[in-house]
């Protein structure tokens, strides 16, 4: 749910458990694999783009390890997952995607990855970065894929201190990528979420985005029910009215 002011001086807001929240002008979403953003934040992304925010995606890997079917080779699967993520992004109003090409299943918090992420941050110049939590959740191990943890940690390090420090990766300055300070990071799947975004009105588009990942979701006849269940729990935890759906984040001030 978004409210867009019609009078001069009014600003677009997101509906959250903390009340209306001003919509950031630019948002960057960084995830380890294609489909991660759609499971974690596609409803929020749709609400943001509806309200006028410019949202960009950065996928650390191409998802080439994301299939148990060995009849498709890694390069073919990577190309397919690029297509699926591009189609999914369009469902929620995103057309700017960057695929970094780091190895699926072997993402590490390296200086090379931090440099790549710093370059994307400086190019897109977001107010808010949405990424995966770097904290392992031992009672929900599926939420703690090693690639997710590494992507989240590398993103936090790229946000602070790398992206704002002109002495970090001086070659980026030579490419015209000036330092940039991100205002906030929103962490998905964090055990201590403190912001829930009401995505009731964008739920159908979230599902459409997830359905675009046919290689990952075609077998899930219960996808709608499963996702609705997760989002209902988020909304109830935040005290939102019965029937509302929410995506949850941990907000980290970084300015």
Locate predicted features.
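Active-site rim/loop-helix segments in enzyme catalytic domains that contact anionic ligands
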Residues: 1-127, 250
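Metal-dependent de-N-acetylase/amidase catalytic core
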Residues: 2-28, 108-255
């Amino acid at each position: 749910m978004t409210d867009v002011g019609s009078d001069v001086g009014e600003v677009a807001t997101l509906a959250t458990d903390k009340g209306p929240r001003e919509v950031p002008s630019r948002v960057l979403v960084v995830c380890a694999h294609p489909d991660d953003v759609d499971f974690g934040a596609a409803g929020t992304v749709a609400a943001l783009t509806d309200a006028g925010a410019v949202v960009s995606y950065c996928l650390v890997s191409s998802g080439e390890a994301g299939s148990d079917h060995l009849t498709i080779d890694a390069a073919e699967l990577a190309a397919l997952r690029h297509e699926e993520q591009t189609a999914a992004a369009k469902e929620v109003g995103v057309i700017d995607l960057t695929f970094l090409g780091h190895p699926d299943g072997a993402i590490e918090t390296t200086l090379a990855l931090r440099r790549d992420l710093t370059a994307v941050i400086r190019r897109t110049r977001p107010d808010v970065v949405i990424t995966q939590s770097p904290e392992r959740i031992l009672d929900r191990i599926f939420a703690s894929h090693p690639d997710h943890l590494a992507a989240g940690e590398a993103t936090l390090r790229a946000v602070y201190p790398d992206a704002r420090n002109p002495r970090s990766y001086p070659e980026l300055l030579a490419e015209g990528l000036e330092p940039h300070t991100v205002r906030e990071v929103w962490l998905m799947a964090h055990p201590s979420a403190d912001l829930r975004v009401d995505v009731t009105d964008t739920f159908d588009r979230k599902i459409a985005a997830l359905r675009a990942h046919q290689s990952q979701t075609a077998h899930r006849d219960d996808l709608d029910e499963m996702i609705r269940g997760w989002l209902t729990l988020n909304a109830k935890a935040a005290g939102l009215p019965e029937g509302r759906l929410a995506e949850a984040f941990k907000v980290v001030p970084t300015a």
